[in-house]
UniProtKB/Swiss-Prot annotation:
It comes from the Bacteria. Keywords: Cell membrane, Membrane, Transmembrane, Transmembrane helix. Belongs to the AbrB family. It is found in: Cell membrane. This is Uncharacterized protein YhjN. Pfam families: AbrB. InterPro entries: AbrB_dup (IPR017516), AbrB_fam (IPR007820). The chain crosses the membrane at residues 11-31, 33-53, 66-86, 94-114, 153-173, 197-217, 224-244, 284-304, 309-329, 342-362. It is a multi-pass membrane protein. One of its GO terms (cellular component) is plasma membrane. It comes from Bacillus subtilis (strain 168). Its main location: membrane. One of its GO terms (biological process) is regulation of gene expression.
């Protein structure tokens, strides 16, 4: 009985929070559902109105919603690793490698700046500036013990700056190229909304692969196992299926699944926020804004250099380097006749690498930093 009551309360909280997501989605921003839901959920969690039926000591809604949101997101990300992406990686491995390494190094430099010049802790700073996507990084922040409120704020700021500035910037430098662009939907995901037997069966196989991989990732104590496990499980099965058949297997996958994932993630993360998380937020916003602008400027400069060295068009290079907004960058690349397959390939591979590799690295960095602090305190204690 109590379980049913808690489930209804959770659904009530998610439904109200999702209204904010729906309103912001009308702006056309691809992560509007996540941002709107997160903002409303955060406000509700801090105000706790009586009609919300949320106990004063309740620490947010059940974590199962976060796991479900992560799993849906992981399945979607895993499907993006298709033959087109692998073909780009094979043909342009040097250019892609340089872009990925520079992107991650510049993001880490941005995190270091945020850590040194604001009062936030090291883990929060690095996770907050990692270019792994607004949908993924706040949930990873929960897993690694970072401040989810600050991570969400910094990620939100960076993604909005990228989405609002990069497309206009490349339009200013746009010169028509005699190159045909792939369809954005085809580049972004091998999925269809047509309800046919073969795509539905393939979807069931992908979901089962995601579930099994999530359980394995949880057993192996991976960070964000529901996200990382489902993403890797689906990617392996998806690429394996394509290798056997010689073409990308098509799954039945509605675009609304992404919206549902964003709502679950935004509502869960927002529900666990409290006022003390925003201590010193003004300074963090200022430093975060400056570091995000610096990151975008550095990425743009790097894109110019890579374009000169490799012969990739400047517009393609800038859109591929942009630290966030996969859907927006893909759409812009198609509109401006840039190489949309290359743009999405670099963006997708970077997100997958960041989600898979950086959390363990941050944990190690955090551990080493903690040991260094302990050593310093023991030395100062013995000298006293």
């Amino acid at each position: 009985m109590k379980k049913d009551e808690n489930l209804l309360k959770d659904l009530w909280f998610i439904a109200i929070s999702a209204a904010g997501g729906f309103i912001l989605s009308l702006t056309g921003i691809s992560i509007g559902w996540m941002i709107g839901t997160l903002i409303v959920a955060c406000c509700l969690a801090m105000i706790r109105p009586a009609w919300l039926m949320m106990a004063p000591d309740q620490k947010g809604i059940n974590r199962r919603w976060l796991a479900l949101g992560q799993m849906i997101l992981g399945i979607e990300l895993g499907q993006k690793l298709n033959l087109s992406v692998l073909s780009v990686l094979k043909d342009h491995w040097f250019s892609v490698g340089v872009m990925l390494i520079l992107s991650i190094l510049l993001a880490m430099l941005s995190g270091y700046v945020l850590w040194r010049f604001s009062k936030t802790d090291m883990m929060t700073s690095f996770v907050g500036t990692a270019p792994g996507g607004l949908s993924a990084m706040p949930s990873i922040a929960q897993e690694v013990g970072a401040n989810t409120a600050i991570v969400s704020l910094v990620q939100m700021m960076r993604v909005l700056l990228v989405v609002l500035s990069i497309p206009f910037l490349v339009i200013l430098i746009y010169t028509k190229q005699d190159r045909t662009a792939s369809a954005a939907a085809e580049t972004i995901s091998s999925a269809t909304t047509d309800f046919r037997l073969a795509p539905v069966l393939w979807t069931v196989i992908l979901i089962l692969a995601a579930w099994g991989a999530c359980k394995a990732a949880k057993f192996l104590k991976f960070p964000a196992p529901w996200l990382l496990g489902s993403m890797l499980g689906v990617a392996i099965v998806h690429v394996g299926g394509a290798a056997v058949t010689g073409h990308d297997m098509t799954a039945w996958w509605l675009s609304q699944a992404n919206h549902v994932s964003q709502v679950f993630l935004g509502a869960t993360i927002g529900s666990k926020m409290y006022k003390s998380m925003f201590a010193g937020v003004t300074r963090i916003i200022i430093v975060g804004f400056v570091s995000s602008v610096g990151l975008i400027a550095a990425m743009f400069l790097s894109a110019v250099i890579v374009s000169e060295l490799t012969g990739i068009s400047l517009i393609t290079s800038v859109l591929a380097f942009a630290p966030g907004g996969i859907a927006e960058m893909a759409t812009t690349s198609v509109t401006l006749h840039a190489d949309s397959t290359f743009v999405v390939a670099v963006q997708v591979i970077r997100v997958i690498l960041v989600i898979a590799l950086l959390p363990p690295f941050y944990r190690l960095l955090h551990h080493l930093h903690g040991e260094k602090k302990d050593k310093k305190s023991s030395i100062s204690g013995s000298s006293a």
